[in-house]
Design a protein with these regions (language model features):
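Catalytic-core regions of core metabolic enzymes
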Residues: 1-691
Length: 691
């Protein structure tokens, strides 16, 4: 675990120095100059510029050496050639934190990178920290420290980003949703301070209720994931991960490699570390608005209060489609709801149609009753609420009182309430008050339901040790027979099979293993047998086995340009169950990961898989399987028996143990793994070694 760095001089300096000060507010130095000048009463402020003169009533020194007092924070906004000297002189003044806005370093050339690395060495030798270069600064709301230039709404999100301009959009969306920032940092080149450093600092910042980050490529992926895991144990973490469609991934040797591309692994690792991972600025802000409440979803049973039949129907559909459950009210709950409904039935969703000022308190009665019912875990309000004061101004104060009462009920029970209001965009007094008292408000019902899904977060897995594996020396390029033997030693079941090196041996093998059989081409260089015509199913007699051997050998060797080691004859597994791919891969950034996907040979087409770092727990992987789109197949769709998901997860864990124990393995994969109600059988396997 990397130690948290002291960023007090960066975010809470007692004195600041701006190198590159100017009155021109069209320049970055001008923005920062004005901000420092406006807040000079909060800290000692020093300006340096070759022009000299005066700014905001303060003298502008022509040299850093002319600044007599020591400084905590130095901000450098001068052309790249002047940065090294500015850094040296700032450190001589005692600066313990530096921000280099200037670009033209590691992001541009090898020469620029060399200069950047020298700056980092100098800064670290002085016991200081460096933000940047090529960054857009930082912001601290409590101390009114603004090295960003733009303005931010106040709130309780601490946000670090690899894209400074994206922060503007996030800030605008936060403001529209009644939220804001406590701290912000643009990390630029991450030459010294990284996103991970910021996340660790934000996790311990008392004023910040949520930690957020925008990431494309963390400098040290494993450290970034560790920082997220540490922070998520303290407060909610939301990561906006960009680059999910990047096409730069190298060709992989297996389905596991193709599915476990860098962007997917990043997202999976972060989710496993406890973060909520989103793909758009809007989703990021929705997540922050929800998670800042500090509430969680105990189970998945939702009660709905609607003031119109259509809203109730649509919200119910959305709840089910999101994988949540509609709560079934007990008789006692139905009796308690009835007085608020007049002639309407106390069913879920509850329909409070035709409400007016005289019955606004009924909203609270319904919500409070549901929240106090054992069979309800959260409540969704959908329709007009939040807008009655807009339609009937005299109802505004009463609606505000009802909103506050609903929030109190939510706090008293510890159960979340989310609101979908047609008046959300107006930001009226009721909408604003709901947000102030930790009731999230959204304009669309799918946003509200997605918010509840975010609150259903699995526990963070920590401290799992890998299990040992049998000692075995693998060849440089193990073919199927060797891979199968290695996996069988881990307790993974395979059908009976034999290797045939001639047509006669193929016929004898069929007699030995039993019909019907599958025949599969064997060669270390043959990565995808099916594509080369190297798999034939349903071989039923020795004569057919002999003929298949001859034709397959010629076909595959001609199509793939490889010499076969032989053809494997294997008894076919009974039909039924679900075909999966289960694999482990050594990711170059995050280390070993495992993958479970649906579809067998079609797994990449279906694109439905879960990924997790290893070592991990089988129970955790089994729970992750619930997030697959095709999970209903595993759970027993259309009268089928449910699959033994725990056994599937145990096999994935063992593959993870194998790749940890054998650093020479880059990938190991079972595809397909036929999973049934009573276990799982491997029908094909591959081990790929490094080199």
């Amino acid at each position: 675990m990397i130690q948290r760095r002291d960023l007090t001089p960066l975010f809470e300096p007692r004195s600041v120095l701006l190198v590159g000060a100017t009155a021109d507010t069209l320049k970055w130095g001008g923005w920062v100059s004005k901000s420092f000048g406006d807040h000079q009463h909060l800290r000692d402020t020093h300006f340096v510029s070759l022009r000299g003169g005066e700014l905001y009533g303060l003298p502008v020194r022509t040299s850093i050496a002319d600044v007599a007092a020591p400084v905590d924070l130095a901000v450098i906004v001068v052309p790249a050639p002047g940065v090294p000297d500015a850094v040296t002189q700032s450190l001589a003044l005692g600066a313990k934190a530096l921000v280099i806005i200037t670009s033209g370093f590691g992001e541009t050339s090898a020469e620029g990178l060399a200069v950047q690395e020298a700056l980092v060495d100098e800064v670290r030798a002085a016991g200081a920290v460096l933000l940047g270069p090529n960054c857009l600064g930082l912001y601290d709301d409590l101390g009114q420290l603004n090295v960003y230039g733009g303005t931010f709404p106040s709130g309780d999100l601490a946000f670090a980003t690899q894209s400074g301009n994206l922060a503007l959009e996030v800030a605008l969306l936060l403001e529209r949703s009644g939220q804001g920032l406590t701290r912000f940092a643009s990390v630029g080149n991450q030459a010294d301070l990284t996103l991970a450093d910021m996340i660790r600092d934000f996790a311990h910042h008392e004023a910040s209720r949520v930690v957020g980050a925008y990431v494309e490529s963390p400098r040290d992926g494993a450290d970034f994931a560790d920082a997220v895991r540490e922070a998520a144990a303290i407060k909610p973490v939301v990561v906006f991960a960009g680059g999910r469609t990047a096409a730069g991934a190298h060709a992989a040797a297996s389905h596991t490699g193709n599915l476990a591309a860098e962007s997917r692994v990043l997202r999976a690792i972060l989710r496993d570390a406890g973060a909520v991972v989103v793909d758009t600025p809007g989703a990021f802000v929705d997540a922050v608005s929800t998670l800042r409440t500090g509430k969680t979803l105990g189970r998945r049973r939702i009660g709905i209060v609607a003031d119109g039949g259509g809203h109730g129907v649509v919200s119910s559909d959305t709840v089910i489609e999101a994988g949540l459950e509609m709560a079934t009210f007990s008789a006692a709950t139905r009796d308690a709801l009835q007085p608020f409904l007049k002639l309407n039935a106390p069913n879920n969703p509850v329909d409070l149609a035709g409400a007016d000022a005289s019955v606004l308190w009924h909203f609270h009665g319904l919500v409070d009753t549901m929240l106090r019912a054992e069979e309800v875990d959260a409540v969704v309000m959908t329709g007009y609420f939040g807008g009655y004061g807009a339609y009937h101004p005299e109802s505004g104060p009463l609606e505000m009182e009802v909103a506050e009462a609903i929030a109190r009920s939510s706090d008293e029970t510890g159960k979340p309430v989310v609101v979908q209001s047609m008046e959300e965009a107006s930001g009226n007094d009721t909408i604003r008050r709901l947000r102030e008292v930790d009731v999230p408000v959204f304009s669309r019902i799918e946003q509200a339901i997605d918010a509840l899904v975010l609150l259903d977060r699995p526990p963070i897995v920590q401290g799992v040790a890998p299990a040992g594996v049998p000692d075995r020396t693998l060849g440089d390029r193990p073919a199927y027979p060797e891979a199968r033997a290695a996996l069988a030693e881990l307790g993974i079941e395979f059908p009976p099979g034999q290797l045939a090196t001639s047509a006669e041996e193929a016929a004898a093998a069929l007699d030995a293993v039993g019909a019907p059989a599958a025949m599969k081409a064997v060669a270390a260089e043959l990565l995808h047998k099916t594509d080369a015509g190297g798999v034939v199913l349903g071989v039923s007699t020795p004569a057919v086995a002999a003929e298949t051997f001859t034709t397959m050998k010629h076909r595959v060797e001609a199509a793939a340009g490889v010499a076969l080691d032989g053809i494997w004859v294997e008894r076919m597994a009974p039909s039924g169950g679900v075909d999966l791919v289960v694999g482990a891969r050594r990711d170059p950034t995050f280390g070993p990961v495992v993958l479970i996907g649906v579809g067998g040979v079609f797994v990449e087409i279906l694109d439905d898989a879960v990924i997790a770092p290893v070592p991990t727990e089988a129970a955790h992987l089994a729970a992750l399987l619930r997030t697959l789109r095709a999970y209903p197949l595993l759970a027993g769709a259309r009268g089928q028996e449910p699959v033994d998901c725990l056994r599937v997860a145990e096999i994935a864990v063992r593959l993870g143990d194998l790749i940890i124990a054998h650093p020479e393995i880059s990938e190991v994969e079972i595809n397909p793994l036929r999973a049934t109600a009573t276990g799982a059988t491997a029908l094909d396997a591959r081990i790929v070694t490094l080199g």
